[in-house]
Structure formats: C-alpha cells, structure tokens
C-alpha cells in the first residue's frame, strides 16, 4: 500500500481487545464492496476509530454500522466514510470543505489525504469534542467553525473539494458557489430518511454536472438552505 502520514504528533491510543483483528476485517469488507483507493484503506486501517465513540461502544467501532455520538447525530459506517472519501478523488495539495464535523472521524480521514480541512459543525458541543479529540491525536491541518453548514465557509474562498455528511433536500446554493471550477462535491440529497449520494462537478462559472452514486441514509442537514 501507499504510505500515508496521518499528521499525528502523538501515538494513537492502543486498540481495544481484538481491535487489530477487527480493523483487518473492516478493511477486507471495504475492499469486497469496491473500495480500492490504497490511500483511503491505509488511513482507515491506521485510524483508531474506537476513539471516536463512547467507550461503551468501542467494541462495535469497526463493524459496518452507524453509531450514536450524542445530540441525535451519528458516526457513519466505515463503508460510507470510505465511499465518500474515495469518490472525492483527493490530492495531497487540496483544500477541502467538510460540512458536519460530527465525531471528527471523517475529518481525520480527510486530514490525512489533503493539505487542509475546513470543517463546519452546527452543534457546539460536538464541535468542541471533535476538536479536542483531533488535537489530542496531533492532527494539526484542520480549521474549525461552529455555524450553519448550509451557508458554507464564512470567509469567501473556493474549495477544490466539498463533502457534506448530512442529508440535504437539495444542494445548498452557497456550497455550489464555493466549489471551484473543476472541483468536486459529494453530498447526500433526498428526503429526511433516505437519500441518494450525489457527485457534483463544477464545469464552468454557471454549470455543474451531477451524477448519482448510490442510495444512502444520513441524518438531516439542518440550516437555512437545508431542513428546518
């Protein structure tokens, strides 16, 4: 596999009992479902996913299931994280906007695969926990904001990649405008319970190409240009 730096200044906490075996099973399951980007597999195999959930759930961290993280939010199943990360087609020099920090796990995956992550979380308590968690791990190439993610990053700037980790009724216009020409966005669109995972590529100043990747299920994207 390709060597990937996780940009950690401190070693990760040791995995729980059976953790290494569970990680191996997780990676094999991801590969069997079409995850082939060696960088994504390397990063997800190295990250201590159990550190992103309550201790009581640590034994379930590497199973292919969503897990609660509080405030009615969830940590996406490993396949979903891997699928979205792979679909972004990340480069190490890229700046990535993430809407929905959540536990910080997806943020950590992105941080290992690009130059800098700009992440927005609307729930202050989750944003604080995620920031503390990532800083403890020594991940330093992330900028954090608390606010309405449907409005994008507060300072106007283009991003090569945008990832949205909650289901939107439609793609927020502000996010479309913050995607640079030639850039790519991965976003779940649809109803509150079921969505389609969409890849949006900006092809010109006023043109975007949309492709449906697969069915998915996310918590609702709440905000001015999302759900109430």
UniProtKB/Swiss-Prot annotation:
A Pfam family cross-referenced in the UniProt record is: PCMT
- Kindly state which reaction or reactions the protein catalyses: [protein]-L-isoaspartate + S-adenosyl-L-methionine = [protein]-L-isoaspartate alpha-methyl ester + S-adenosyl-L-homocysteine
Query: What EC number(s) has UniProt assigned to this enzyme?
Result: 2.1.1.77
Q: What is its main location?
A: cytoplasm
Q: GO molecular function: any one?
A: protein-L-isoaspartate (D-aspartate) O-methyltransferase activity
Q: Which SUPFAM superfamilies match?
A: S-adenosyl-L-methionine-dependent methyltransferases
- InterPro entries from the entry? PCMT, SAM-dependent_MTases_sf
Cellular localisation: Cytoplasm
Q: Which Gene3D superfamilies match?
A: Vaccinia Virus protein VP39
Catalytic residues of the enzyme: 76
Enumerate the UniProt keywords alphabetically: Cytoplasm, Methyltransferase, S-adenosyl-L-methionine, Transferase
CC annotations in GO: cytoplasm
Give me the ranges of the annotated region Disordered: 1-20
Q: Which HAMAP family match?
A: PIMT
Briefly state the protein's biological role: Catalyzes the methyl esterification of L-isoaspartyl residues in peptides and proteins that result from spontaneous decomposition of normal L-aspartyl and L-asparaginyl residues. It plays a role in the repair and/or degradation of damaged proteins.
Any idea what this protein is called? Protein-L-isoaspartate O-methyltransferase
The gene that this protein is the product of is pcm
């Amino acid at each position: 596999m390709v060597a990937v730096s996780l940009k950690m200044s401190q070693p990760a906490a040791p995995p729980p009992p059976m953790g290494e075996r569970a990680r191996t099973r997780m990676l094999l399951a991801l590969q069997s479902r079409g995850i082939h980007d060696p960088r994504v597999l390397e990063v997800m195999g190295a990250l201590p996913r159990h550190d992103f959930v309550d201790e009581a759930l640590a034994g379930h961290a590497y199973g292919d299931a969503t897990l609660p993280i509080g405030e009615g939010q969830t940590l996406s199943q490993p396949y979903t994280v891997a699928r979205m990360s792979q679909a972004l087609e990340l480069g190490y020099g890229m700046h990535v906007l993430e809407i929905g920090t959540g536990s910080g796990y997806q943020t950590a995956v992105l941080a290992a695969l690009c130059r800098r992550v700009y992440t927005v979380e609307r729930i202050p308590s989750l944003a604080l926990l995620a920031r503390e968690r990532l800083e403890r791990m020594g991940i330093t190439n992330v900028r954090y904001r608390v606010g309405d993610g449907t409005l994008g990053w507060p300072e106007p700037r283009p991003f090569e990649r945008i990832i949205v980790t909650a289901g939107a009724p439609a793609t927020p216009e502000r996010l479309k405008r913050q995607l640079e020409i030639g850039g790519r966005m991965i976003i779940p669109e649809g109803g509150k319970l079921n969505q389609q995972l969409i890849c949006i590529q900006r092809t010109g100043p006023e043109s975007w190409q949309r492709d449906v990747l697969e069915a998915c299920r996310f918590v609702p994207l709440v905000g001015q240009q999302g759900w109430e």
